[in-house]
Amino acid sequence: MTDNTSAPMYTLRGLQLIGWRDMQHALDFLCAADGQIKSGTLVAINAEKMLAIEDNAEVKGLIEAAEFKYADGISVVRSIRKKYPQARVSRVAGADLWEALMARAGAANTPVFLIGGKPEVLSQTEQKLRAQWNVNIVGSQDGYFKPEDRQALFERVRDSGAKIVTVAMGSPRQEILMRDCRMICPDALYMGVGGTYDVFTGHVKRAPKVWQNLGLEWLYRLLSQPSRITRQIKLLRYLAWHYTGKM
């Protein structure tokens, strides 16, 4: 019988990544059978994030400090498989992992706190989570708050008893907030989710499943938003690392 409560670690350019075989492995790793949730910070790693780690010391420190770094991008998965031919690792997309965690939280009545997004998007996210999975949302805060309100927010998270805290503020803002909130409320699983609330509520269209399964979600985004071309060109440096064995 396969043990889903542990997972191997793989190293790419000095960064330790969890190797999950599939979504079920990820869920069983993070959520125990008795309903207990691991404490720590989840960070999705793709090629763009790998470049940010190299170029920005603050981002590097934030991401290296996170307990659970996993392969969100297909390019990162391919790099792991190239460097470790025996690795049984698959892409676990952050948006899909968030939905799976919310479904599991609803079934187990795990308290959830949502942070980030526009007020109307956050409200729609709450409504849909309750309707779809009966998620026990014990608090929320949109992304439009003042720096002086941060401490009060952290205390609200702590006092809510939340065991899962998801933060949709983009990188590195969400990683900074999760790090600081954990100093006040350490006993929870924190997950940075970027634009996931927008996708979940239908405000942003995600690539069709066939594109995702082919590892071409990046191409779909580029065709949908040609302005992303500059960001995509920067990823050529990652490809150079991959093909020259510098991972």
Curated annotation (Swiss-Prot):
Keywords: Glycosyltransferase, Transferase. It catalyses: UDP-N-acetyl-alpha-D-mannosaminouronate + N-acetyl-alpha-D-glucosaminyl-di-trans,octa-cis-undecaprenyl diphosphate = beta-D-ManNAcA-(1->4)-alpha-D-GlcNAc-di-trans,octa-cis-undecaprenyl diphosphate + UDP + H(+). InterPro entries: UDP-ManNAcA_Trfase_WecG (IPR023085), WecG_TagA_CpsF (IPR004629). Catalyzes the synthesis of Und-PP-GlcNAc-ManNAcA (Lipid II), the second lipid-linked intermediate involved in enterobacterial common antigen (ECA) synthesis. GO terms for biological process: enterobacterial common antigen biosynthetic process. PANTHER family: PTHR34136, UDP-N-ACETYL-D-MANNOSAMINURONIC ACID TRANSFERASE. Belongs to the glycosyltransferase 26 family. The gene is wecG. NCBIfam families: PRK03692.1, wecG_tagA_cpsF. The keyword Chloroplast does not apply. Pathway: Bacterial outer membrane biogenesis; enterobacterial common antigen biosynthesis. This is UDP-N-acetyl-D-mannosaminuronic acid transferase. GO terms for molecular function: lipopolysaccharide N-acetylmannosaminouronosyltransferase activity. It comes from Enterobacter sp. (strain 638). It comes from the Bacteria. Its EC number is 2.4.1.180.
